[in-house]
């Protein structure tokens, strides 16, 4: 959908370095995310509870009492998708094929890949998607 709006070639190499994820309990939220995505969380204290997603992206979980839920989308490999989906099923999280259908228990195949949506304990909508196969 969004890809159709982008030019074929992007003239710059831009990566997202970090973003702040609001949570009622930053440590619990960081642990949830790290456990579900198969990442490590090292609680060294400090203002943020950081989870390093890859070599360029860190999610900085931060305590907040009042926040709107956000949508975070992650492009993952097929193997990563399978492993995370297995952990979603093991933990009993509901999931769905679209942001408007978060509990239908189905995956989508938009753009030739696989996708799934689910909510974290803070109400943020998380999306996993794979490349076309």
Language model regions located:
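Vicinal oxygen chelate
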Residues: 74-121, 125, 132-133
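Residue-level detector of conserved, well-ordered beta-strand and adjacent loop positions
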Residues: 52, 62, 119, 129-130
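Core segments of cupin and vicinal oxygen chelate
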Residues: 13-14, 20-65
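Short aromatic/hydrophobic contact patches that present stacked aromatics
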Residues: 18-20, 50, 71-73, 115-117
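Short, charged/polar surface micro-motifs in flexible loops or helix N-caps
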Residues: 56-58, 66-68, 77-82
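Acetyl-CoA-dependent GNAT
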Residues: 44, 63, 102, 130-133
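N-terminal beta-strand motif that seeds the catalytic metal site of vicinal oxygen chelate
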Residues: 2-27, 72, 132-133
């Amino acid at each position: 959908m969004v890809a159709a709006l982008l030019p074929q070639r992007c003239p710059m190499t831009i990566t997202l370095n970090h973003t702040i994820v609001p949570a009622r309990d930053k440590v619990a939220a960081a642990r949830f995310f790290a456990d579900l995505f198969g990442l490590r969380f090292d609680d060294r204290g400090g203002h943020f509870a950081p989870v390093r997603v890859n070599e360029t992206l860190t999610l900085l979980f931060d305590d907040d009492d009042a926040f709107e839920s956000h949508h975070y989308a992650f492009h993952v490999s097929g193997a990563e998708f399978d492993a995370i989906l297995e952990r979603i099923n093991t933990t009993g999280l509901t999931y769905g094929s679209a942001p408007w259908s978060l509990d239908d228990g189905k995956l989508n195949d938009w753009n030739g890949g696989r996708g799934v949506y689910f909510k974290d304990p803070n109400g943020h909508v998380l999306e996993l998607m794979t490349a076309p196969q």
